[in-house]
A protein has these predicted regions:
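Short, well-ordered alpha-helical
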Residues: 75-171, 175-178, 208-210, 322-323, ...
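Bacterial N-terminal signal peptides
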Residues: 57-70
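Short glycine/serine-rich loop/turn segments
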Residues: 152-293, 318-322, 346-348, 489-508
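Glycine-rich, small-residue loops and helix-cap segments
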Residues: 97, 154, 194, 246, ...
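Bacterial N-terminal signal peptides that target proteins for export
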Residues: 46-59
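Structural helix-boundary/capping segments
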Residues: 114, 244-349, 363-372, 407-411, ...
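Short, Lys/Arg-enriched N-terminal segments with co-localized hydrophobic residues
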Residues: 31-47
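Short helix-loop capping/hinge segments that flank enzyme active sites or metal/cofactor-binding pockets
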Residues: 153-172, 334-348, 398-473, 478, ...
Length: 580
């Protein structure tokens, strides 16, 4: 990372903490950090004294800006940009009469028009709810007469297109399911509507929640920070839409990192909950051993607020019984700016070393945690687990998709495929034709063949991994945390910057599927930006049902660093201010 950028980030992060800035400058000078930042200094004619001067100057500038930030903040305390406003801010505006749900929906629809249908054409939105404005008017009147149902009353939410909605198609991004209208809402969608949330849109995704970040229904999705970059998958449409402020809240699904990859790639916050905390009813399955819906938003506060609305025991999903007496209905109560003060954090260095700038940002994040009082220690996963985790995941994932997708297909119209074999047959026919209103996806459709040939749930290999491998992974990760009394293990959510849309760059060995193999929760918070202005996120992996603690830690980190920024491709539109 270029030295001025890194120094500015640190200066801004610690601008209101003079002692921490001084301490950090001395620490980095002692470590000769300018030598790492200017490795070619002698060739470029930059002396070490010049580098040191730049380092000090940029840090002092950051400190100056931080010290005067309270004055600026006081002047603008009553006005926020749309993307800056949390649910709490919006409810304050609702209560003061300066904002209505109808107006909020209009603001988001204008942004979708400007940046998804026109402009950079992010291609994140598949379907808009044509009743959204009318629903907003009804909810405004209800608020006036009887008050709000919940903090989500009148708040627009956008859903990944593999989550059932009875009033909009659910295709999982696939032409194989084009036009499918489910018989009812998914359990979590019903919970959202009952809380007064407005389902604004259905979002593009990696087809059938796997493969490249495109779908045969919607095509490729673009990253609002750089449209030549991928928003990652499979919840890429949700990640791009929330970063670009097409809705206040988004829902993705995560089987092997599909909430967390798009969260970090688009510079937002998100959560892969503990397996069983949220119902999977009405979600197109990929592998039920791993599948989990996850809230995504620009702010940790909003992620916490949305999660509490969706929890609860669902008789149609046996996994939710694990959350009995362990789920909360209000996670915002655990948001604590001082939560890092007594925390013990493990850094999984197994996932560093693949992108120097990502590593720099993670190291700066660790310093931020230490400055807030946290103790940070190194942890390492057993090498054998790192070696086998991919095979375990694929073995279970492919076989479960083959066995479980027919159960979902049985709930939709007779005109749709009813088995994986029928899906393969129809995909082959579509590829031989020129479909209207879609784009063939041979990469994902060829994977259907591999899934069909993968085996059954009776295979000894599957049984061994499911019944013995997964519990072993759980014991190992819990043991790592117990051995050092850790509150969370952190790591770069993606060890490299987002890949190009055409597939170049990105990749690397990721830790994300460890949270799926174990079923443990994983909270992602923005950590910074690379020199080419691409987002980097940091993951907080915790024990089962430790979401309250993770929210405290993540919120404290977010408030201490405040590195989130609006994507350059989707700037604010005129009149988007929220007046509280």
């Amino acid at each position: 990372m270029p030295l001025p950028d890194l120094a500015r980030a640190i200066g801004l992060c610690y601008g209101r903490r003079r002692r921490e800035v001084t301490k950090l400058v001395r620490l980095f000078e002692k470590a000769d950090i300018w030598r790492l930042a200017f490795p070619e200094s002698s060739e470029r004619g930059v002396t070490m004294s010049t580098a040191r001067c730049v380092w000090r100057t940029t840090l002092l500038l950051g400190l100056f800006m931080g010290l005067y930030a309270p004055v600026t903040n006081a002047l603008s305390a009553q006005i926020l940009g749309l993307s800056e406003a949390t649910i709490e801010d919006i409810n304050t505006a609702f209560n003061s009469g300066t904002l209505t749900s109808e107006r909020l929906v209009e603001l988001y629809l204008a942004r979708i028009q400007a940046y998804d249908q026109d402009g950079p054409r992010l291609n994140a939105v598949l379907w808009l709810n044509d009743q959204a404005l009318e629903t907003a008017r009804i909810l405004d009147e209800e608020r006036r007469l009887s008050g709000p149902r919940s903090p989500l009353h009148g708040i627009p939410v956008a859903l990944k297109d593999n989550i059932d909605t009875a009033d909009m198609p659910t295709t999982a991004g696939s032409l194989l399911l084009a036009g499918s209208l489910p018989p009812d809402d998914a359990f979590i969608v019903e919970k959202l509507r009952n809380a007064g949330a407005i389902i604004l849109a259905k979002l593009n995704m990696s087809e059938l929640a796997s493969g490249v970040t495109m779908s045969s229904v919607g095509g490729f999705i673009r990253n609002p920070h750089d449209i030549e970059r991928s928003p990652a998958g499979s919840s890429g449409g949700t990640g791009a839409a929330i970063a670009a402020a097409f809705a206040q809240l988004g829902i993705g699904t995560d089987t092997g990192g599909s909430v967390r990859g798009p969260t970090t790639a688009n510079g937002i916050a998100g959560l892969k909950p503990t397996h069983g905390l949220l119902s999977r009813d009405g979600i197109v399955p990929l592998a039920l051993s791993f599948d989990m819906a996850g809230p995504m938003a620009r702010h940790v506060y909003d992620v916490a607020a949305m999660l509490g609305v969706m929890t609860g025991i669902d008789p149609d999903d046996v996994a939710t019984s694990k959350s009995s007496n362990r789920f909360e209905t209000n996670y915002t109560q655990f948001l604590d700016v001082s939560a890092l003060g007594d925390a013990r954090i493990g850094i999984a260095r197994d996932f560093l070393g693949q992108d120097t700038e990502v590593d720099w940002i993670i190291e700066a994040s660790l310093e931020a945690m230490r400055a807030e009082g946290a103790t940070v220690v190194d942890v390492h996963f057993p090498q054998w687990l790192l070696d086998v985790k991919g095979d375990w995941y694929t073995t279970i994932r492919w076989r479960e998709f083959r066995a479980q997708i027919p159960e979902y297909l049985a709930t939709i119209g007779r005109e749709y495929p009813k088995t994986l074999s029928e899906m393969v047959e129809r995909s082959m026919k579509i590829m031989s034709l020129t479909p209207e209103g879609g784009t063939p996806n041979p990469t994902r459709w060829s994977l259907l063949v591999q899934e069909e040939e993968s085996g059954t749930l009776d295979d000894h290999e599957y049984i061994a991994m499911k019944n013995y491998g997964l519990p072993m992974a759980q014991s190992i990760v819990a043991g790592l945390m117990d051995a050092q009394n850790l509150d969370a293990i952190v790591y770069p959510t993606s060890p490299t910057r987002p890949s190009l849309v055409n597939g170049g760059g990105g990749g690397g060995v990721s830790a994300t599927n460890i949270a799926n193999l174990t079923g443990f929760p994983d909270l992602i918070v923005p950590a910074g930006f690379t020199s080419d202005q691409l987002p980097v996120g940091i993951s907080f992996l915790g024990r089962p049902f430790s979401e309250p603690r993770l929210f405290g830690l993540g919120y404290a980190f977010e408030q201490a660093t405040k590195v989130r920024r609006d994507p350059k491709m989707t700037p604010p539109l005129l009149g988007e201010e929220i007046r509280r």
